[in-house]
Curated annotation (Swiss-Prot):
Family annotation (InterPro entries): EF-hand-dom_pair, EF_Hand_1_Ca_BS, EF_hand_dom
Listed GO MF terms: calcium ion binding
Residues binding Ca(2+) 1: D25, D27, N29, D36
Annotated binding of Ca(2+) 2, by residue: D115, S117, D119, E126
Protein name: Calexcitin-2
Alphabetic keyword roster: Calcium, Metal-binding, Repeat
Annotated source species: Caenorhabditis elegans
Domain of life, source organism: Eukaryota
Lineage: Eukaryota, Metazoa, Ecdysozoa, Nematoda, Chromadorea
Length: 189
């Protein structure tokens, strides 16, 4: 059970706020702006190399994700996304029958970013390294990985595939169940 699970609605919103502050609002000014996405592209270029597939993927995918996010909440690409906008975006995504375009694009991008070796699996070392780009410390990242990386028998596994990643992603953004393993996917909430 997740430690912050007192009220299901508040718990879900705390996960969304964590995603907002950790993975989107990189300059910590309380807003998501195109600048945050540009900064992330630069960080990936510095860490993985400007000729790497990861940098090229970031340069192609992140502008598309930004455009789809702003479009989903009726904003122009030059606009900003507030925490309130973000919560509203996550709420509407949760109610949607089909996965929204911005979230579909972002989950695909995140899996590619985490799968550094390109073997279509995310192992603990890759996970810990990438979460480090977003300021999540190694100890917390390792602990979180161990909370979701297990097989159907409940045994810890060394890596997760794309299918499991998608299930965990959906749990993170949609589940009010404090025992869902996906609650740990994006780090300690």
């Amino acid at each position: 059970m997740h430690p912050k699970a007192a009220n299901p609605k508040e718990f879900l919103e705390s996960k969304w706020k964590h995603a907002f502050t950790t993975f989107f609002d990189l300059d910590q000014n309380g807003l998501i702006e195109w600048k945050d996405f540009k900064d992330l592209i630069e960080v990936i270029g510095e860490v993985r190399g400007r000729r790497s597939d990861f940098f090229m993927t970031a340069r192609l995918c992140l502008p598309d994700i930004w455009q789809k996010m702003t479009e989903a909440i009726g904003k122009e690409e030059e606009d900003i996304i507030t925490l309130s906008d973000w919560i509203q975006l996550c709420q509407s995504s949760r109610k949607s029958v089909r996965e929204p375009a911005w979230q579909k694009a972002y989950v695909e991008y995140m899996f590619k970013l985490l799968d550094e070796s390109g073997d279509h699996l995310v192992d603990q070392a890759e996970y810990v390294q990438v979460l480090g780009y977003f300021g999540v410390n190694r100890k917390d990242s390792s602990h979180c990985f161990d909370q979701f990386a297990f097989n159907h028998q409940g045994q810890l596994i060394n890596s997760i595939d794309k299918k499991k990643f998608h299930v965990l992603w959906k749990q993170f953004f949609h589940s009010e169940d404090p025992s869902s393993p996906g609650n740990w996917l994006l780090g300690k909430v």
